[in-house]
Amino acid sequence: VTVDCSGYPKPACTLEYFPLCGSDNQTYANKCTFCNAVVEKNVTLNHLGEC
């Protein structure tokens, strides 16, 4: 599974909850917060859902 993070980072994210588990073992609330971390910290996707 891959997440398309083109167009990120964004200055603000919505509050929708669709959790993604990052390679840093942190649960990101949604694609926007995850993709911001990808751009800022070079995180990758471990799996969909909470860590």
UniProtKB/Swiss-Prot annotation:
Keyword terms, alphabetized: Disulfide bond, Glycoprotein, Protease inhibitor, Repeat, Secreted, Serine protease inhibitor
Positions marked as site (Reactive bond 3): L15, E16
Glycosylation sites: N42
Domain Kazal-like: 3-51
SUPFAM superfamilies per the UniProt record, alphabetical: Kazal-type serine protease inhibitors
Cysteine disulfide partners in this protein: C5-C35, C13-C32, C21-C51
InterPro entries assigned: Bifunctional_prot_inhibitor (IPR051597), Kazal_dom (IPR002350), Kazal_dom_sf (IPR036058), Prot_inh_Kazal-m (IPR001239)
Pfam family, one: Kazal_1
Chief location bin: secreted
Superkingdom as given in the UniProt entry: Eukaryota
Places the protein is found: Secreted
Gene Ontology CC terms, in alphabetical order: extracellular region
Domain free text: Avian ovomucoid consists of three homologous, tandem Kazal family inhibitory domains.
Record's protein name: Ovomucoid
Annotated organism of origin: Nothoprocta perdicaria (Chilean tinamou)
